[in-house]
Amino acid sequence: MSLTARDKSVVNAFWGKIKGKADVVGAEALGRMLTAYPQTKTYFSHWADLSPGSAPVKKHGGVIMGAIGNAVGLMDDLVGGMSGLSDLHAFKLRVDPGNFKILSHNILVTLAIHFPADFTPEVHIAVDKFLAALSAALADKYR
């Protein structure tokens, strides 16, 4: 699924509105994923506390949203721009790439909760397409 120029514009504009709360969104989305999809906890078994709002969940949620923020600036070459993270997740962390879709869903839910007025159908579609493209880029090294 390719991103149109309009999709990219919508994602950029929406990211401008949310970037100040990106850490909060990331922490909540990650906590939501770990609760709703407990099988994803296996990748974080080295954390002492996996509960929503815990320090490790908050920290990693911020890391995730920071990477997504970087990806917003790389929309014209997500595969190349996210190559390092793809390597990390495929070869070192060995994350099942299906989990990228699960996290993307939880990010969308969290964005809709935190930004109800801004999360219009057009924004929803564009951000969903962007996260799907990002997930595909992160899964690129799995092939």
Swiss-Prot record:
Described function: Involved in oxygen transport from gills to the various peripheral tissues.
GO CC terms of this entry: blood microparticle; haptoglobin-hemoglobin complex; hemoglobin complex
InterPro entries in alphabetical order: Globin, Globin-like_sf, Globin/Proto, Hemoglobin_a-typ, Hemoglobin_oxygen_transport
Domain named Globin: residues: 2-143
Binding site for heme b: H89
One annotated GO biological process: hydrogen peroxide catabolic process
Tissue and organ distribution: Red blood cells.
Alphabetical UniProt keywords: Heme, Iron, Metal-binding, Oxygen transport, Transport
Gene3D superfamilies, alphabetized: Globins
UniProt keyword Transcription, yes or no: no
Similarity comment text for this entry: Belongs to the globin family.
Name of this protein: Hemoglobin subunit alpha
Assembly: Heterotetramer of two alpha chains and two beta chains.
Positions with a binding annotation for O2: H60
GO molecular function: haptoglobin binding; heme binding; metal ion binding; organic acid binding; oxygen binding; oxygen carrier activity; peroxidase activity
